[in-house]
Swiss-Prot record:
The lineage of its organism: Eukaryota, Metazoa, Chordata, Craniata, Vertebrata. GO terms for cellular component: ESC/E(Z) complex. This is Polycomb protein eed. WD repeats lie at residues 93-136, 148-187, 190-230, 236-277, 306-343, 361-401, 410-443. PANTHER family: POLYCOMB PROTEIN.
Length: 443
């Protein structure tokens, strides 16, 4: 089924006027975007092996005080056990950068593999089928032509089990789409500027985290339409927040941004647990008082010793952190010393322990985000010239991580984000030239 549906205007304003585009750093002026799949290329290059030496950057010169690292220098990537083949590609007809892509990991076994892309004022849903087919399901267009969606995240309705997709971008408005009823069912206005990333809580499908250009993070309850907490202020981020992630238990948030910092925020405090419980109990029809959102001004840990530039992507890997900047490396690290329990880290802790680096090349522009598969066994990142790097994370020591480089002569535009299907059989990459690339894992 194909469709295009306009999303209605919200009943409130998002605050100050916001830029309508992210920094566009790579494009193909001669492209003729369409939605027809390209012919499969049997001559796909799947290169594995050692990467060339990476030039020195401020992050691999002298170590910051309190830093500790396993081993010396860099490690060489050996042949990775994972192999992929590009089986299909297509271009969306708006021709603008696609900033985000996410598979729906909440689907049941046997259901079609559905993923969403966001870019320009468009949200598009696709199904992956056998023989490399990518089938267009639905396309939603925002009523404001100046909207530019940057991020999306999947959850589900607890009462109906319908999959829900949250999207947001330059206007700072969060929209919730039910693709079964084909409607934008909710929207949230609160941030004073663009929203750069959305994440749902790993154990509570109603808790949505948003991070913004207004220097703050917000935690929402989409079941009761309440703003649970605002993270920022006195000791919060000093510039645009670019990324954040929940740990697997949903007890901690790590955020990062343009101020080069990474900050840890705990959700398991009595104050926040009480606020979350209160958000479920709040009923506006029974009271005239608005819900009182918690304002969290002080993070539980903060550091600027990992990166020397914008930190544009962060993910938890167990109790470890993976983060990247515009420095051609993803850094694996942990707060405190190696032997420290992360749950006992104090806000004044100044030590960080660097365990390893995943090096790559030609990726020194910002807002390029990596992803992991559901079981956190693979790590994927694209660079600004269309190359994909896939690391095998099933190693005891990050220094022994193995990498595969995926290249295609036709893919030369910046890869903004990647996403694995839940079973890790498919890897999707989206690019600045509105192209979508499907890589199937070879068994």
């Amino acid at each position: 089924m194909k469709m295009r549906r306009k999303m209605s205007e919200p009943h409130g304003e998002a605050g100050n006027e916001m830029p309508n585009k992210k920094q566009k750093l790579s494009s193909d002026e001669n492209s003729n975007p369409d939605l027809s799949g390209d012919d499969n290329d049997d001559a796909v290059s799947v290169e594995s092996g050692t990467h060339p030496e990476r030039p020195d950057t401020p992050t691999n010169t002298a170590s910051a005080p309190g830093r500790k690292s396993w081993g010396k220098g860099k490690w060489k990537s050996k042949k990775c056990k994972y192999s992929f083949k590009c089986v299909n590609s297509l271009k969306e007809d708006h021709g603008q950068p696609l900033f985000g892509v996410q598979f729906n990991w909440h689907s049941k076994e046997g259901d079609p593999l559905v993923f969403a892309t966001v870019g320009s004022n468009r949200v598009t849903l696709y199904e992956c089928h056998s023989q490399g087919e990518i089938r267009l399901l639905q396309s939603y267009v925002d009523a404001d032509a100046d909207e530019n969606f940057y991020t999306c995240a999947w959850t589900f309705d607890c009462s109906s089990s319908h999959p829900l997709l949250a999207v947001a971008g330059s206007r700072g408005i969060i929209r919730i789409i039910n693709h079964i009823t084909m409607q934008c069912v909710k929207h949230y206005v609160g941030h004073g500027n663009a929203i750069n990333e959305l994440k749902f809580h790993p154990r509570d499908p109603n808790l949505l985290l948003s991070v913004s250009k207004d220097h703050a993070l917000r935690l929402w309850n989409i079941q009761t339409d309440t703003l649970v907490a605002i993270f920022g202020g006195v000791e919060g981020h000093r510039d645009e927040v670019l990324s954040a992630d929940f740990d697997l238990l949903g007890e901690k948030i790590m955020s990062c941004g343009m101020d080069h910092s990474l900050k840890l925020w705990r959700l398991d405090s009595e104050r926040l647990q009480r606020a979350i419980r209160g958000s479920y109990e709040y009923n506006p029809s029974k009271t005239n008082r608005p819900f009182v959102s918690q304002k969290i001004h002080f993070p539980d840990f903060s550091t600027r010793d990992i990166h020397r530039n914008y930190v544009d992507c962060v993910r938890w890997l167990g109790d470890l952190i993976l983060s990247k900047s515009c420095e051609n490396a993803i850094v694996c690290w942990k707060p405190g010393r190696m032997e420290d329990d992360i749950d006992r880290i104090k806000p004044n802790e100044s030590n960080v322990t660097i365990l390893g680096r995943f090096d790559y090349s030609q990726c020194d522009i910002w807002y390029m985000r990596f992803s992991m598969d559901f079981w956190q066994k693979m790590l994927a990142l694209g660079n600004q010239v269309g190359k994909l790097y896939v690391w095998d994370l099933e190693v005891e020591d990050p220094h022994k991580a193995k990498c595969t480089t995926l290249t295609l002569p036709r893919c030369t535009s910046a890869i903004r984000q990647t996403s694995f299907s839940r079973d890790s059989s498919i890897l999707i990459a989206v690019c600045d030239d509105a192209s979508i690339w499907r890589w199937d894992r070879l068994r």
